[in-house]
Amino acid sequence: MWHLWDGTHFWISGTRSRIWCRQIGHDPRVSLCIEALAPVAGHIGVDGTAEVLEPPAFDIWPLSRRLAEKYVGRGDPANAAAVDAFVANMMTEPRILIRLTPEVWRAIDMRVYRGKRADREHQDSA
């Protein structure tokens, strides 16, 4: 799931037809977990309230483009054509944005585990 953190909210892209998007429209209580493997395995989790935003009441395209730049473009201006093509395709779908306002934060830093990995590979070698 693509996400963007702006310092106050998480922004998540979806479509009206996806079940999870429709469920958020009925019940705005959400949890989000973001995992990372490098440079150190860990994750953050947030519980909060989500709001479904969609055109024409909200211009979703500037933030949708930032999401595409993050994941398709990977921050490299040389990938601008790929980002443009991806956003053009997104605009053919019934897109929405989810604005998640965190209320509770959790974090786990896996460096506390021997070998700095808390995965099956480490467990099998113990």
Model regions and ranges:
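Charged, gly/pro-rich active-site loop segments
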Residues: 42-126
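Flexible, glycine-rich phosphate/dinucleotide-binding loops
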Residues: 19, 39, 106
